[in-house]
Amino acid sequence: MAGHSKWANIQHRKGRQDAKRGKLWTKIIREITVAARAGGADPDSNPRLRMAWDKATDANMPKDNIQRAIQRGAGGADGESYEEVRYEGYGIGGAAVIVDCMTDNRTRTVAEVRHAFAKHGGNLGQEGSVAFMFKHCGQFVFAPGTSEETVMEAALEAGAEDVATDEEGVIEVVCAPADFTAVRQAFEAAGLKAEVDGVVMKALNETELTGEDAVKMQKLLDVLESLDDVQEVYTNVVFDEAQ
């Protein structure tokens, strides 16, 4: 696919997320609170809280903020009670989109998500309409130039499912969600730092968009990610390198 660079797409998305750091902190605090409420305040016995804690650390969130969010969740303090809800839909050219939310008002959230899809050339689908196009897994992406041998050794010893290197030298490691923390710790012990990592919905097949379609799709994704209740947006779209 001419102009399609996986590394450029990763860098582009990471740059957009970094630019929204204030909103990112809000999302992570919500994630920490929900994780602590569901599984307790000890990250060593609460894998979901451990992942949220690591995400907060990577985002340079002060430890005091993290601890307050844990205490608020584990203490069962009165206030908002969030539920997790997933929406599925289609973007430009039938591209698949998954929107994961945490909300205290499902009616408000679905209205906002539906409006975003409709206004920007997409449409909200039924439950299950696109989820089959994605795999729920742990994912680590390493920059070109990273030692493939070192990554491979650490990954497989920690129980990763797959290690793949593309023509640009980008190394991708996939593992079961339950093994994510163990694999991450194995990489840290080996002195490796992934450019991007997380438990994600990984697209099984990609749809490339270029030109005006790419611009419109990027706008839809930006609007969805800007909604207060939205935690994560996944898509099977890759953009032309020039976008």
From Swiss-Prot:
Disulfide bonds: none annotated. The keyword Heme does not apply. GO terms for biological process: regulation of DNA-templated transcription. The keyword Flavoprotein does not apply. It comes from the Bacteria. GO terms for molecular function: DNA binding. It is found in: Cytoplasm. Keywords: Cytoplasm, DNA-binding, Transcription, Transcription regulation. Residues 1-21 are annotated as: Disordered. Transmembrane segments: none annotated. Its main location: cytoplasm. Gene3D superfamilies: 1.10.10.200, 3.30.70.980. GO terms for cellular component: cytosol. Coiled coil: none annotated. Belongs to the TACO1 family. NCBIfam families: PRK00110.1, PRK12378.1, YebC/PmpR family DNA-binding transcriptional regulator. This is Probable transcriptional regulatory protein BP2308. It comes from Bordetella pertussis (strain Tohama I / ATCC BAA-589 / NCTC 13251). The lineage of its organism: Bacteria, Pseudomonadati, Pseudomonadota, Betaproteobacteria, Burkholderiales.
